[in-house]
């Protein structure tokens, strides 16, 4: 994209009514959620696309840069930074990444052009504890909706390691 598409901050999301945004970002690349004639992006999507130079975010006539969006996201979610690292890693690998809040996870991940997601991703810091009950519950939900449960562990250097968790019945 040559000229960044303008988006406007609205609460914990950004939106655009521009047809170019809908065609290039939503229809062609799977970003955001379309509601009527508006394309809404999460703050993580907005930060990613701002960092790539594809969009610019405006709040009250002031442009929000990548660092501003990261700071805003971190003020609303203490794990915003690691969720962003995982989001960026998956998007850079060519996957479509959507919220998985309704499945009790952070992300649903789709292969490009796939209608259904293959994975549910739960993002954790390397030193963060997760109880066996948390792991079991997430694996059970993923199995119930025919998806693979994946733990994305982010170390202090910002590197991500993915662990697939399977529900096995004997």
Curated annotation (Swiss-Prot):
Keyword set, alphabetical order: Lyase, tRNA processing
EC number annotated for this UniProt entry: 4.6.1.16
A Pfam family it matches: tRNA_int_endo_N
GO biological process: tRNA-type intron splice site recognition and cleavage
Substrates-to-products reaction catalysed: pretRNA = a 3'-half-tRNA molecule with a 5'-OH end + a 5'-half-tRNA molecule with a 2',3'-cyclic phosphate end + an intron with a 2',3'-cyclic phosphate and a 5'-hydroxyl terminus
Keyword Ribosomal protein on entry: no
Superkingdom of source: Archaea
Top-level EC class: lyase
Record's keyword annotation contains Lyase: yes
UniProt-annotated catalytic positions: 110, 116, 147
Gene Ontology MF terms: lyase activity; nucleic acid binding; tRNA-intron endonuclease activity
Quaternary assembly: Homotetramer; although the tetramer contains four active sites, only two participate in the cleavage. Therefore, it should be considered as a dimer of dimers.
Biological function: Endonuclease that removes tRNA introns. Cleaves pre-tRNA at the 5'- and 3'-splice sites to release the intron. The products are an intron and two tRNA half-molecules bearing 2',3' cyclic phosphate and 5'-OH termini. Recognizes a pseudosymmetric substrate in which 2 bulged loops of 3 bases are separated by a stem of 4 bp.
Family: Belongs to the tRNA-intron endonuclease family. Archaeal short subfamily.
UniProt-recorded name of the protein: tRNA-splicing endonuclease
Taxonomic source organism: Pyrococcus horikoshii (strain ATCC 700860 / DSM 12428 / JCM 9974 / NBRC 100139 / OT-3)
Lineage, uppermost ranks: Archaea, Methanobacteriati, Methanobacteriota, Thermococci, Thermococcales
